[in-house]
Regions:
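Active-site metal-binding motif and surrounding structural segment of the metallo-beta-lactamase
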Residues: 40-91, 119-121
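Single conserved hydrophobic/aromatic residue that forms the stacking wall/gate
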Residues: 167-178
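Alpha-helix N-cap/helix-start and coil->helix boundary motif
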Residues: 43, 53, 66, 96-97, ...
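Generic preference for hydrophobic
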Residues: 6-8, 90, 117, 136-138, ...
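Conserved beta-strand hairpin/beta-sheet module of binuclear metal-dependent hydrolase folds
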Residues: 1-49, 87, 150-152, 159
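Metallo-beta-lactamase
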Residues: 93-147, 155-158
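Alpha/beta-hydrolase-fold enzymes
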Residues: 158-164
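Hydrophobic packing residues within well-ordered alpha-helices of enzyme cores
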Residues: 46, 72, 100-103, 177-178
Length: 178
């Protein structure tokens, strides 16, 4: 299996302080990055942690309390200013959709990348993202607002057989089945 890294950029603080930042984590797997929540100060923490901006494939927002999403519009704006062209998917509670539309229309309407919002059902567990190497599914959470956690599962890979390590002592025949 490939390395599966989690960068904790912020946790445990509703307000940014000198020692703590609001919620944001980046899961890194197979040269791709996925952000969970984007609290205020996330960009600064990404730079401190040497987490690159150009590999973020998707952003998953758990709920729309400010400490989990106030850094989002700044992040999206920075992606545009840095010349991003790759589409970006944002997953979050349906209540985030209208807020995101207003912010994007006001601040980010002339960037060269597409932003796709995917409303997640915070009341049931479901796969919301899937590619060749992993799936991401929601986990309903109890909170004052609609809220979901995100479970990242790496898909199993087939073992790689190195022909140079296989020693066959007798001649073999090849059979074709039609």
């Amino acid at each position: 299996m490939e390395p599966f890294k989690v960068h904790i950029l912020g946790c445990g603080s509703a307000l940014p302080t000198l020692r703590h930042n609001p919620s944001s984590q980046v899961v890194e797997i197979r040269e791709k990055q996925f952000m969970i929540d984007c609290g205020e100060g996330t960009q600064t923490q990404m730079r401190r942690s040497r987490v690159g901006f150009n590999k973020v494939m998707a952003i998953f927002i758990s709920h729309i309390h400010g400490d989990h999403c106030f850094g989002l519009i700044g992040m999206l704006s920075s992606f545009g200013l840095l010349g991003r062209t790759m589409p970006l998917s944002i997953y979050g509670p349906k209540e985030l959709g209208p807020i995101l539309d207003t912010l994007l229309t006001t601040f980010c309407n002339d960037f060269d990348y597409e932003i796709k919002f995917h409303a997640v059902d915070t009341t049931r567990q479901e796969v919301v993202y899937e590619d060749r190497s992993l799936t991401v599914e929601t986990i309903p959470l109890k909170h004052r607002l609609p809220c979901a956690g995100y479970l990242f599962r790496e898909k199993p890979t087939l073992p790689h057989i190195r022909l140079s390590l296989i020693h066959i002592s007798e001649p073999t025949r090849r059979y074709a089945i039609s």
